[in-house]
Amino acid sequence: MSGLAIDMTGISKAFGPVKALVDADLRVARGTIHGLVGQNGAGKSTIIKVLAGILKPDSGRITINGTRVESLTPASVERLGVHFIHQERLLVPTATVAEAVFLNYELRFGPFLRPGAMKRRAEELIRTHFGLELPGDTLVRDLTTAQQKIVQITRALAQEAQVLVLDEPTAALVKREVDSLFAVLRNLRAQGIAVIFISHYMQEIEDLCDEVTVMRNGTDVGVVRPGETSIDEIVSMMIARDVGEMFPCRSHALGAPVLRVEGLSQAGHFRNVSFEVRAGEVLGITGLLGSGVKELVECLFGLEQPDAGSVTIDGEVRRFANPGRAVQGRVALVPEDRRAHGVATDMSVRDNITIASLERYMTRGFVSRARENEAVDGFIRELSIKTPHRDQLVRNLSGGNQQKVALAKWLSCQSRVYVLDEPTVAVDVGAKVEIYTLLNRLAAEGAAILFLSSDLLEIAGFCDRALVVYRGTLNGEFAGETLDSDLLLAAASGARAQRKEA
């Protein structure tokens, strides 16, 4: 029998004139963790939907655990041992762990449920595979995000899964939870289970995967081993150009200081923080989890109040009692969790873009729909927002396009200061380049940009200067030749405070 758990060969799929897959291959060996990467639109989702039995391919051959299959349905795929762990947590909050594990596969004695047996079996599975003691009567809503992910995986293992497909499984996890999940996946690999790991996080791909299939324009363009191929080389395969071209060059001159922060403090979070951002400048700020960076951002936008210090915008001291006052002061915040706080996913693209600036489109006390539509269409063109029309619900857009909608909202407000919290998180490489280009254009027009990111390569490659926060205080300023990811990491980890100038 072949050593392949999944063998998809020559898979093609078209939707009318659009070719989503063109002679694509995906081969995954048993007992390996196999990465699947590519930009949005590269074909990742389509080939996984074919594997899941959701889409029927136009041509190609599929073999699962040595069995050639002519047609697939979601039910038949599960019977063949292939299970999917989706990015969204599809668990009932009021269910117990045991109920979530055995939903639709309940243990019975004749017509009667066996809740005690299900509880014991769920606890045994979690203990055996993950080394955790998790009571089976715990409610799902009381679990951490990582524990909920474990319950999803346990549900698959209860049905004797031989292949697990995980779609962006770390998107909502903190680093400690990511480390725990990776330990779980490595343990499953040791048990002979094949894992397909889909992620935009290249560092995770490098740390976890044995092999990686890279997709571009609907086909696979190579299978590489992370230990033998660098992240930059993988990204270059994804975007068909050198990774150095990701970050646009800025040639415009910097203007006068727009944002000046002096002696800002908040008990328990940060103290005596001072910096300035000039017109046309992108200032990076980074720090480890718990460093105080998030709380600093909240104070700048009026979500929290500092205990001491001042914020000056264009020479005027401002104190924002709430986010509404910050918006009036022409300060914009694009939050890390865009789906929860950056955009209203059940509203249209148009309504999201204009919600904070409707007064600009008022005529005699009423919103001029024509003026609003004209402005929105302009933003859609300017930002290359991929949407069929302005009335499309934002939830139907990709992550990168949702982020562009969030940025367009503040462009509509004609903001002066942009505070961006992890603006490229869970965004594919192509969309990242588009976001960098947009921010570069904003800077060239005189905006002051505060760019928060935990991706140190991104900070080093995109920003003019960078500040590092360590345990609530600034522990280094870096610019020019010294703006280096290794130096940033050292400062973020508490290395001796230093100040580096260009």
From Swiss-Prot:
Keywords: ATP-binding, Cell inner membrane, Cell membrane, Membrane, Nucleotide-binding, Repeat, Sugar transport, Translocase, Transport. SUPFAM superfamilies: P-loop containing nucleoside triphosphate hydrolases (SSF52540). InterPro entries: AAA+_ATPase, ABC_carbohydrate_import_ATPase, ABC_transporter-like_ATP-bd, ABC_transporter-like_CS, P-loop_NTPase. Residues 6-242, 253-496 form the ABC transporter domain. ATP binds at residues 38-45. It is found in: Cell inner membrane. It is a peripheral membrane protein. Its EC number is 7.5.2.7. The keyword Signal does not apply. One of its GO terms (molecular function) is ABC-type D-ribose transporter activity. The keyword Nucleotide-binding applies. One of its GO terms (cellular component) is plasma membrane. Gene3D superfamilies: P-loop containing nucleotide triphosphate hydrolases. It catalyses: D-ribose(out) + ATP + H2O = D-ribose(in) + ADP + phosphate + H(+). It comes from the Bacteria. Pfam families: ABC_tran (PF00005). It is an enzyme of class 7 (translocase). Belongs to the ABC transporter superfamily. Ribose importer (TC 3.A.1.2.1) family. The complex is composed of an ATP-binding protein (RbsA), two transmembrane proteins (RbsC) and a solute-binding protein (RbsB). Part of the ABC transporter complex RbsABC involved in ribose import. Responsible for energy coupling to the transport system. PANTHER family: CARBOHYDRATE TRANSPORT ATP-BINDING PROTEIN MG119-RELATED, GALACTOFURANOSE TRANSPORTER ATP-BINDING PROTEIN YTFR. This is Ribose import ATP-binding protein RbsA. It comes from Cereibacter sphaeroides (strain ATCC 17023 / DSM 158 / JCM 6121 / CCUG 31486 / LMG 2827 / NBRC 12203 / NCIMB 8253 / ATH 2.4.1.) (Rhodobacter sphaeroides). The lineage of its organism: Bacteria, Pseudomonadati, Pseudomonadota, Alphaproteobacteria, Rhodobacterales. The gene is rbsA.
